[in-house]
Amino acid sequence: MATIQIKNIGPITDTGIIPLTSVMLVIGKQSSGKSTFLKILCFCRWMEKLIMVSDEEAISQYTHNLKFLKSMKQFHRFNDSYFSSASSIRYEGDTITITMENILSDVKILRKPEFETVRYNTKLSFIPSERNLVSVIRNIDQSYRSAESDVLFNYIFEWGEAKDSYTAEHPKRLSFTDNIEYINDGGNDLVRLINENKMIPAYYASSGVQSAMPLDVMADYFTGLVGKNASVSKHDLANTLARYLGKDKELTNEMLKSISNKMKYQSVQLFIEEPEQNLYPDSQRNLTINLVCALKQAMPKGRGDSMLVMTTHSPYILSTLNVLIAEAYAM
């Protein structure tokens, strides 16, 4: 089982060794390190995904010139004050290990012995607490500016990708309410009141809809990608074939299987900050159940480990997961 341990980063003193399960909930008071944990875990999982689908240069690139730490700080907007000489990360993934002993030395990234046979492609998405920005700021995809790609830039990009699938002919029924659908009308975000057959721009929707709608839509879209072809550039495909053909004159069934695992998404990993935002307890429950169900439906379609990791302040989210666990054990 994959694990992670984080010490002396931001509010975190020592997480201990935490096993990574398919559904994880990090609950606690504000400013206790929940988001810090989520962001570091997400970055380590992304690092593993990059190495699994890339060529030999990926490890070398991130184990020199402090690139691992610099990239993590830049993407997740960590301040320098979060780190000290005592900061450390120990991540043991499915196919690699990452060890950061301090901020002055490069990380060590090692492939596990079974790397070549186990490696696979996975779809990751970090859905931040600021997700309602895509609803409350018009044309945010055109107005948001960042000197470098960061978590918000990436989120806005992924939202644009996800919402394209949900048109008037194929709307997304929102799980946290029983009377609203999401529709992308030529790039405009609309919600339809089903009982009244009335369209409302998301800009004018309630705060609960503005917060939960992007989460609901993106979770549905990305869990639906498992088992489908991944977007792979011609350059990456050529490098993959060259690496295998460089070892042998012809492709074996094992090599073809490994290539196939890279060409299709074998799992999905969702990292969600505060899914409860602006939602009534009953709506929190419905949204949580839908997220778990979407993950469960995606799992049989791939061979990798799918994950749903959430941070929350809400006892209702915790209670819902406890009930689901109790029901699973009862079965």
Regions found by a protein language model. Give the residues of each.
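P-loop NTPase switch/coupling surface
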Residues: M1-G186, K301-D305, S319-M331
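Switch/communication elements of ASCE P-loop NTPase nucleotide-binding domains
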Residues: M1-L50, E196-M331
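Secondary-structure transition/turn motif
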Residues: E92-T95, I103-L104, L193-K198, Y204
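Bergerat-fold GHKL/Histidine-kinase-like ATPase
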Residues: L174, I183-N188, E196-M199, A212
